[in-house]
């Protein structure tokens, strides 16, 4: 710690870690890297690596060894005894793990484009009990909990631990002036004479309630304010960080001059509630903050499949208080802020008196108002914030949408899709693209066969193209067989962050499809000439989550297309003539 920043809170563990090596060593690593196995980092691993290299995760010097991992899972302590609540691990495939020898192997850590970012000196390789990890860290093994689901179902099955030597942090080309490392932020605090700094963590746009909460917190502890939003991985379905950052920039002027600062944090959140609140505070401590705001349901993932919250509304505050001395950061607890209509002001909900008229808009209602193009009241947020949100979340009739057909060969998917295409082209408004199963096979997936693996690849390709069309405000009509439920769900999750996704199940029976057999495929399948034929020798998993179900044994193609159009109208994806103009 330099003399100029000595008045700030000390980093966790006493020293701010910096893992970037000298230039000459970088050249040496590049020369030797061809001898080492390479690992392409996932999105989460990229975020973790950046904060390891810059010291945001001080005192960690690399991905955790087994001793540190076990200590963190079981009692929130590193092997050294220092408090640390969250496992920071490098998960790899079994095939990759088998190549490694603890004590001698080195790994070239690369970004998805192949740029080498760091060297990992392998100290430990082990297969963790990921369900036990989820239970310890998240107090849940439910797939409805995004953190637990990632640990159990999405992370690779083997962990590699060891010290890191950094060559560069992952490159960023957006908001560069706001991406301050712990050392850079500490230097800014020192330059401006900030000694007491309270950090406000957020993964959502800020509205009037958040501004009031942050202002009150800073005033209460007589500190300057750091607005420190997460711009790494957050909860699925969150507003994209580009939109959020534009909103944060607009709101800086709402705070007294020279008392608030905005900086971006490339963190991959885990949504671990109480444990995550402590983790967030330690990270802000490393960035020079002496205080940390913990609000209602801090870093909570919402509710489980039974509608019960995973964590209590103020469980994070209670948990933080127990460990506050070890954290080394003072908590500033706050209740949820609510608007009192008669007094035209925001107050914590524990200050509401009998007879007060309280107004509030939930995140779900806000998104619904944006989708429907409805007014968002000035008491809730600022006009400039609404304007930014409307750019990213236009009314539904202006959004992109994917209409994704699934059904057996010969069920009528392509015919209905073509009728739908002509109706959209006739009315105009948005560009329309038809991704027919046979045409995609011909032009995009000609090298693929019909094994389960190849079918999945084909559908994911279609999903990716459809997501790009949807993202850019167009209509994508997809008409593959898409026999597997998990793959269809993957495509839905790929597209829904960008616009609408309508799953249309053409539920025509195999008997009717076989009677039609325009291409003679069923006859060949029955004769054993065609192997792995859906509905005969390969299974078709009927969807339980279809938005529209159609049986072409009962409806004509025109009638079926009209049913889909009516559904799109009900959901708001087709506006009136005046709205579409």
PLM features: residue spans?
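Glycine-rich phosphate-binding loop of ATP-dependent small-molecule kinases
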Residues: 188, 192, 319-323, 331-503, ...
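Active-site cores that bind ATP or allylic diphosphates and position pyrophosphate for catalysis
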Residues: 2-398
